[in-house]
């Protein structure tokens, strides 16, 4: 049911050659449900495009991520350029490989600090060790995970923040490209629209994931309207 609105909104987002900004993130309703959502950045906010609901506390894995990403990919205008931002719970070998196979897709994936990385000099280390003591650092052609997934790394530690951004990307790493990751913050006020500052989704008495899925559709249509 959402497809016509999603297609129209995605087409409008790139009608003058702009890059389409997608974010992937998860929100939970206590321990009752986990909701993984892909949204479109619109100004300082976001619009939902596709989501999956699972009962119980969970980090929804690549199988679910891929299904949502491929649904959104099918709605994109031909030749559209895409930037996908995702938080540090989601990067995996499978996700990197999927993104590498998508023409016109760029990514900014935040990484945990405990991932193995071969920086191309010295010994294999961790992403956190590479970030230690640096406010900015940019590394091209590194190899992530034990499987050796090729990517670029940008590290940005803003004063006053407890943790740095460690961002994997398939574009040249520098200050401007690492700051692209801030585009994902539009998904946070969107989740607030669903929850405490809007529809009060956290107060739902629904017990079944499929019914919550339909409720999200109704709320999303209201956002598009």
Where are these regions (language model features)?
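Active-site-proximal cofactor/substrate-binding loop regions of enzyme domains
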Residues: 10
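An active-site-proximal beta-strand-loop segment
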Residues: 23-35
């Amino acid at each position: 049911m959402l497809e016509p609105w999603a297609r129209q909104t995605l087409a409008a987002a790139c009608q003058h050659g702009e890059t389409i900004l997608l974010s992937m993130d998860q929100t939970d309703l206590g321990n009752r449900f986990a909701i993984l959502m892909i949204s479109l950045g619109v100004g300082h906010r976001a619009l939902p495009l596709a989501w999956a609901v699972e009962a119980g506390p969970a980090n929804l894995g690549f199988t679910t991520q891929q299904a949502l990403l491929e649904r959104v990919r099918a709605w994109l205008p031909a030749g559209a350029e895409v930037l996908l931002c995702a938080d540090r719970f989601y990067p995996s070998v499978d996700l990197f490989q999927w993104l590498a196979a998508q023409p016109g897709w760029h990514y900014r994936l935040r990484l945990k600090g405990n991932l193995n990385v071969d920086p191309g000099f010295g010994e294999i280390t961790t992403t956190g060790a590479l970030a230690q003591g640096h406010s900015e650092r940019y590394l091209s052609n590194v190899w992530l995970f034990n499987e050796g997934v090729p990517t670029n790394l940008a590290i940005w530690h803003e004063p006053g923040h407890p943790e740095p951004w460690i961002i994997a990307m398939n574009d040249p790493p520098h200050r401007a490209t690492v700051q692209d990751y801030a585009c994902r913050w539009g998904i946070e006020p969107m989740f607030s629209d669903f929850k405490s500052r809007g529809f009060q989704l956290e107060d739902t008495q629904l017990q079944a994931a499929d019914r919550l899925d339909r409720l999200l559709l109704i709320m999303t249509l209201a956002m598009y309207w």
